[in-house]
Amino acid sequence: MLYYLLHYFNSTYNPPGLGVVEYLTFRASAAAITSLLITLLAGPGFIRYLRSRFIEPVKEEAPAEHRKKKDLPTMGGLLIIFSIEVSVLLWSKFDDPHVWLIMLAVLWMGVVGFIDDYRKVVLKVKGGLSPRWKLVAQVALGLVVGIYTSLDPAFSVLMRETSVPFFKNLTIDYGYFYIPVVIFIITALSNAVNLTDGLDGLASGSSAIVVFALGGFAYLAGNAVYATYLSIPFIPGGGEIAVVCMAIVMASVGFLWFNSNPAEIFMGDTGSLALGSAIAVIALLIKQELLLPVLAGVFLLETLSVSVQVLYFKYTRMRFGQGRRIFLMAPLHHHFQLKGWAEQKIVIRFWIITILFFLTSLMTLKLR
């Protein structure tokens, strides 16, 4: 919106210095600053409002340290989503299909998360929205993204193909499996970030690092020269995704101002499902979804810890008559909590691991 206004003045009157608005790096930086300022300035009032209405219920089986947070407000994801949407509308070419497809994913799963949080907090429905309906929403979003990118010429014939990390000019053609792959990745990532959101700042900080990396890949993929040099798929117009990524990064960082230990607010499913779906759609659009097991490694480990715990418990119960556990508690961060690790130490160590995964992902650009 603001971009189009400044673009009009620049092309009509050509005032000195206004041409900078045409640079992708300027608009990405402006979106980042705008998103951060909105979150920081709106945060205190938003927290006061939520504290008077929406208090996060804490499970009785949660670690003792976690049960102390029973009086904190949830649904903080609304603040993240608002900051992202406003920043993107102001500084991106929001008629670009890449942009609004990501924004659709953020809003779509944000609404699903809000319904889940509302049912838990206000309606006092144990468990909130049933897993079945969450899955229906995730599959529906995957269908929309998959079908639209398959049919819209703006996404070209490359959408059914993807690059393979560590291999130069090697691609995989999904063919008829493209839409199921899209559904799986969106479902897996949104659930993975949701599972990770269990400690102060863990999900927001980790998401910021992952999306920052994806923003770098998007910038490179949107430039034909860089894409050719690095042997990654060239995505026409994909550079606009970098603007969206920076808005998401700084909205998450701004939220971290209030969500770091000791937290003043939780993002709830409203934020975690929205961020997870955004990560998935961005990776799909820039053809780096096969890099997600590395880049989003922390989210993968958290999800695997839950899956392994459940499967092992069921197996041992069937084999020995009594279920046994590998971890003290799943997801993985709660295991370390029960081992006596301080919450801040767990979060910072997980951030460090995420940064290591980020750097490993960058190495794949040259290790081909």
From Swiss-Prot:
Pfam families: Glycos_transf_4. It comes from the Bacteria. It is found in: Cell inner membrane. It is a multi-pass membrane protein. One of its GO terms (cellular component) is plasma membrane. InterPro entries: Glycosyl_transferase_4, PNAcMuramoyl-5peptid_Trfase, PNAcMuramoyl-5peptid_Trfase_CS. GO terms for biological process: cell division; cell wall organization; peptidoglycan biosynthetic process; regulation of cell shape. Keywords: Cell cycle, Cell division, Cell inner membrane, Cell membrane, Cell shape, Cell wall biogenesis/degradation, Magnesium, Membrane, Metal-binding, Peptidoglycan synthesis, Transferase, Transmembrane, Transmembrane helix. It catalyses: UDP-N-acetyl-alpha-D-muramoyl-L-alanyl-gamma-D-glutamyl-meso-2,6-diaminopimeloyl-D-alanyl-D-alanine + di-trans,octa-cis-undecaprenyl phosphate = di-trans,octa-cis-undecaprenyl diphospho-N-acetyl-alpha-D-muramoyl-L-alanyl-D-glutamyl-meso-2,6-diaminopimeloyl-D-alanyl-D-alanine + UMP. Its main location: membrane. Pathway: Cell wall biogenesis; peptidoglycan biosynthesis. The chain crosses the membrane at residues 30-50, 72-92, 98-118, 139-159, 170-190, 208-228, 238-258, 264-286, 345-365. PANTHER family: PHOSPHO-N-ACETYLMURAMOYL-PENTAPEPTIDE-TRANSFERASE, PHOSPHO-N-ACETYLMURAMOYL-PENTAPEPTIDE-TRANSFERASE HOMOLOG. This is Phospho-N-acetylmuramoyl-pentapeptide-transferase. It comes from Chlorobium luteolum (strain DSM 273 / BCRC 81028 / 2530). The lineage of its organism: Bacteria, Pseudomonadati, Chlorobiota, Chlorobiia, Chlorobiales.
